[in-house]
């Protein structure tokens, strides 16, 4: 039976995910077999496991830090927002349907057996499970049916560490208010408090720690187990997208990602963001586009609505103008579908109807009732056009999409089909599943998420852009992505280990609740 520790926060973006990532790495370094767990995650960023199930990317990152393969057991419930008041509900990696917030609130208690099955399976396989909460445990309007904070802590019988974010101010009020709003039995489960994202001299903070403990003493005896400094590490974070959207400065190689209103899987571009002389700018206005070397249309949770946004905002016309000047255009998943000629929604998956695409690729898309979920790998074959240097490069990634794309007219296979996994295509029925296609010049599209994570592919694309501009490739690119990620996990672990009382945390895990 595994020991457990749970990280809960005073609010969203308090740093729970990164602290779980850090603890997974620290415990791995200390010789333990450790797994992350989050009963319910809400995110548009998702991942497909080897066995074809969909899960949140935060737990994928945490699994990487722990040195294990991600499993849907680590995130049994994933909510992917479709509107301001509704989400697609994914349970054990498979779609259960779309629900409004009120309907899901009534339904979620029925998912407790599935949550416990996942947790208990991990419990048998690992030494330690590091559990992540969501938002705040003190959302008193939601507590009655809680399955992700104190409700989960009770189910797992897990001691809790409560994290407050000092960077946004009011950390003592955050911590005091959260503890005060909890029930007595819930307070008893909190075994330590952590202040996160601190800048400055800890000695100046220490009187406040003592005063807060004194103020809490009538209702709870909870020690501080650490003050974690504001640490700059380059690790995927679900809540970091707003910071990424602020980047507007063009560099030697400039890549513009269209900031669609319902953008999903923006982690597809993480590898491209690594290089000091490459800018990845997220733009939502024509005035922000400038003259990039590459334009990427990303994935989206609603392709049709976001295509309408593209059209109404004037970005479609701007993209077509850039294409006429031979700018490299690349679409992923929903962005790939937009680059085609027509999109049809006969089953009302995205609201019904049909809409004309940008007509830059010879495909039509029909939205189906069933979602495609799978990993994919192979070798690129006979890539045409500007990125012909990708021929022979290996690829690996995953697909998550509702649409099925077909050739819109008779096309030359060698000109448009770049992937060599022939079992994934059915030319007799004119369908395309996981193929990278081009217009034979400088427009490309794929259903494959994670394609830029492959070092050979990323290197070739940046190298091609450098060559077009007469820039020395070595000035821009010198990088091993996998090694870099490992270094970042170690850097995070070092910073957190040195600032937490790990001896006390091991004692908390040993004693339990």
UniProtKB/Swiss-Prot annotation:
<keyword id="KW-0315">Glutamine amidotransferase</keyword>
<dbReference type="InterPro" id="IPR011698">
    <property type="entry name" value="GATase_3"/>
</dbReference>
<dbReference type="Pfam" id="PF01656">
    <property type="entry name" value="CbiA"/>
</dbReference>
<feature type="active site" description="Nucleophile">
    <location>
        <position position="333"/>
    </location>
</feature>
<dbReference type="InterPro" id="IPR047045">
    <property type="entry name" value="CobQ_N"/>
</dbReference>
<protein>
    <recommendedName>
        <fullName>Cobyric acid synthase</fullName>
    </recommendedName>
</protein>
<dbReference type="Pfam" id="PF07685">
    <property type="entry name" value="GATase_3"/>
</dbReference>
<keyword id="KW-0169">Cobalamin biosynthesis</keyword>
<dbReference type="InterPro" id="IPR033949">
    <property type="entry name" value="CobQ_GATase1"/>
</dbReference>
<dbReference type="InterPro" id="IPR004459">
    <property type="entry name" value="CobQ_synth"/>
</dbReference>
<dbReference type="InterPro" id="IPR029062">
    <property type="entry name" value="Class_I_gatase-like"/>
</dbReference>
<comment type="pathway">
    <text>Cofactor biosynthesis; adenosylcobalamin biosynthesis.</text>
</comment>
<dbReference type="InterPro" id="IPR027417">
    <property type="entry name" value="P-loop_NTPase"/>
</dbReference>
<feature type="domain" description="GATase cobBQ-type">
    <location>
        <begin position="252"/>
        <end position="457"/>
    </location>
</feature>
<dbReference type="GO" id="GO:0009236">
    <property type="term" value="P:cobalamin biosynthetic process"/>
</dbReference>
<comment type="function">
    <text>Catalyzes amidations at positions B, D, E, and G on adenosylcobyrinic A,C-diamide. NH(2) groups are provided by glutamine, and one molecule of ATP is hydrogenolyzed for each amidation.</text>
</comment>
<comment type="similarity">
    <text>Belongs to the CobB/CobQ family. CobQ subfamily.</text>
</comment>
<dbReference type="GO" id="GO:0003824">
    <property type="term" value="F:catalytic activity"/>
</dbReference>
<feature type="active site">
    <location>
        <position position="449"/>
    </location>
</feature>
<dbReference type="GO" id="GO:0015420">
    <property type="term" value="F:ABC-type vitamin B12 transporter activity"/>
</dbReference>
<dbReference type="InterPro" id="IPR002586">
    <property type="entry name" value="CobQ/CobB/MinD/ParA_Nub-bd_dom"/>
</dbReference>
